[in-house]
Amino acid sequence: LVLDEPTAGLDPEERIRFRGIISDLSQQKLVLLSTHIVSDLEAVANEIILLRKGVVLEMQKPASLLEQLNGQVWLVTVPAADETALTKQYTCSNVMHTDGKSVIRLLSESAPRPDAVPTAPNMEDLYLYYFGR
């Protein structure tokens, strides 16, 4: 069964329900799910194939793919005024603003700053690692 973006446009409740259906179907059939909604992959995928222009980049279990990024995802807390310089220099997967500071989640092979804290990679980080800038 091939499903192309099956949860696009669904509200969160329907997305959860539909992912349950996909999971049930996968017990009896091979289900290929094409999506950029990484939360869908986290919820139902036993194995992930990353494709770029028809070429297989990776084909592994989600945990194995995420392990590749260990030590390459960092949290950095900086004054909000310094945010732009970091997000231009590194691939950024998230920014949270609090009390005049920016907590930035960055992808980098080494610590982007001495005060950077390593954090566990997630599927969005994985997506950006392979398909981001």
Regions found by a protein language model. Give the residues of each.
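Residue-level recognition of hydrophobic positions within alpha-helical transmembrane segments
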Residues: 10, 36-38, 120-121
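ABC transporter nucleotide-binding domain
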Residues: 18-106
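Short, Lys/Arg-enriched charge-dense amphipathic segments
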Residues: 1-2, 75-77, 84-89, 115-127
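Helix N-cap at the start of a conserved alpha-helix in ABC-type nucleotide-binding domains
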Residues: 12-14
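Catalytic Walker B motif of ABC-type/P-loop ATPase nucleotide-binding domains
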Residues: 1-5, 10
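C-terminal coupling/interaction segments
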Residues: 94-133
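Short, flexible active-site loop motifs that bind/organize anionic cofactors or intermediates
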Residues: 5, 28, 55, 113-116
